[in-house]
Amino acid sequence: MWRSVIAGCGSYLPANKVTNANLAERVETTDAWIRERTGILVRHFAAEGEKTSDLAMAAARAALADAGVDAAEVDLIVLATATPDQTFPATATRVQAGLGCRPGAPAFDIQAVCSGFLYALSVADALIKAGQARTALVIGAETFSRILDFTDRTTCVLFGDGAGAVVLRATPSTGDGGERGILSTHLHADGRHHDLLYVDGGPSSTGTVGHLRMQGREVFRHAVTNLYEVVLEALAANGLQADAIDWVVPHQANQRILDGTAKKLGIDPAKVISTIALHANTSAASVPLALCEARRDGRIQPGQLILLEAMGGGFTWGSALVRL
């Protein structure tokens, strides 16, 4: 039996920083209004001509270097994005070619919006456990600045661009309860709520790219409930209590959602990794970005139990319990 171990982690943020004050020059808002409602101070926007694949490749190169793995060893790429370079081919194929990964190995995109990285991680984990891959790149990358409506102050202030990636390595499972790797993943969706968070465009509907639309109050209500339940599901599946978790790495949607979920679970807020202030909501990139930052600054250490969780449009939501 194979187990997927996170061997390396990497991230990338575009150089262009956009502060709340910058946005206040473009839309009717203030720095105080954004801070109080979201916790966001700054976000990064991709430069003109900088594509999702460029962000993804930068994060992937950093992850490969961190893992000490050559790109030629990668035999699977799963890329989570809601903002692909093109309708097709998959952005993952451009990443595969750009990195010099092995031709012929599978590379594909997954679209579950802000839950996308957890969906991608779960799929890659399943393929490794099935013996169909040995070294996988799992990437979350977004250029959400391209689909924002800068006349809608309730949404355009929330999002940023970025990418995060992890390298998964197949490792023989010993059956030891303390071994490293992905211990469990849980995925969910409820399409009845697809019209609460969506983009009002698409090739088969309007023939346009469209802009992001969101009913924020309803999304908040569902997010706290769904994330609470999926965390309990992960704990129950592994026979654990909440105090066994060393760190929670949530999707960075809004500081209020992070705080509300932690309070409902009875988890110490100090155990919750928050990068929302400096990254904003980067959709599928937010979980790996936060994971990599906390690992890089020394908060997350080898052997610790890490709970990843996210919810996105659809609705989609999920969790992954990992021992690093």
Swiss-Prot record:
The active site is at residues 114, 251, 281. Signal peptide: none annotated. Pathway: Lipid metabolism; fatty acid biosynthesis. One of its GO terms (cellular component) is cytoplasm. One of its GO terms (molecular function) is beta-ketoacyl-acyl-carrier-protein synthase III activity. InterPro entries: ACP_syn_III_C, ACP_syn_III_N, FabH, Thiolase-like. Pfam families: ACP_syn_III, ACP_syn_III_C. Residues 252-256 are annotated as: ACP-binding. Keywords: Acyltransferase, Cytoplasm, Fatty acid biosynthesis, Fatty acid metabolism, Lipid biosynthesis, Lipid metabolism, Multifunctional enzyme, Transferase. It is found in: Cytoplasm. It catalyses: malonyl-[ACP] + acetyl-CoA + H(+) = 3-oxobutanoyl-[ACP] + CO2 + CoA. It is an enzyme of class 2 (transferase). The last Arg residue of the ACP-binding site is essential for the weak association between ACP/AcpP and FabH. Belongs to the thiolase-like superfamily. FabH family. This is Beta-ketoacyl-[acyl-carrier-protein] synthase III. It comes from Rhodospirillum rubrum (strain ATCC 11170 / ATH 1.1.1 / DSM 467 / LMG 4362 / NCIMB 8255 / S1). The lineage of its organism: Bacteria, Pseudomonadati, Pseudomonadota, Alphaproteobacteria, Rhodospirillales.
